[in-house]
Amino acid sequence: NMACDAGYDLVIPYTNVNLTDVKGLVQDAIFSRSIKDAKRTGIFICGKDASLALDMMDLAKKSMVPPFEISVFPDPAGSFTTAAAMVACTEKTLKEKFKTDLKNKNVVIYGGKGIVGGISAIMCAKYGSKCTIVGYDGIENVSKKADEYKNRFEVNISPADG
């Protein structure tokens, strides 16, 4: 629906796509059009799993053969754009009201195991915040998520059980 609202001429949804499908879909999109038209083609990766969406993006980029390249944008469940908006609003408020930013701030994100909270924590940690994500189903589960973020995004995020 966002692509339609943005004025795209054609939107073709694919459902139940997995990693093994990505290369074929990307190459079908790039090789079935001229180079000029391929540049006007984009793949929007949705779903509900941020790690899988990023894996799909990485594979999509590796599947391209220059100069046949297209845009690829992952935003599973709208989480990346929602997290970016949340962090941007927080930064704006800190700047306007307190003349500061997120660097070296202690940031606690409740629901941090969820997709939006997790991406927000990653963004804040990348900016230099000291982040804690709070989960509600035991310290083991939230610790696994914090470790996943550390391994994939090279950020230090502390787990806490709420």
Where in this protein do the model-derived segments appear?
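Glycine-rich phosphate/diphosphate-binding loop of Rossmann-like nucleotide-binding domains
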Residues: K92-G162
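General beta-strand structural signal in soluble alpha/beta enzymes
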Residues: I45, S71-P76, P159
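N-terminal ligand-binding/catalytic initiation module
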Residues: N1-F68
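Short, surface-exposed connector motifs at secondary-structure boundaries
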Residues: D37-R40, E69, A125-T132
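A glycine-rich, Thr/Ser-enriched phosphate-binding loop motif common to dinucleotide/cofactor-binding enzymes
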Residues: P74-K92
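Glycine/charged-rich beta-loop-alpha catalytic/anionic-binding loops adjacent to active sites
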Residues: V65-F73, K103
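Extended hydrophobic secondary-structure segments that form protein cores and membrane-embedded regions
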Residues: I43, D75-P76, N106-G111
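Gly/Ser/Thr-rich loops at beta-strand to alpha-helix junctions
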Residues: K48-A53, G78-T82, G112-G117, G138-E140
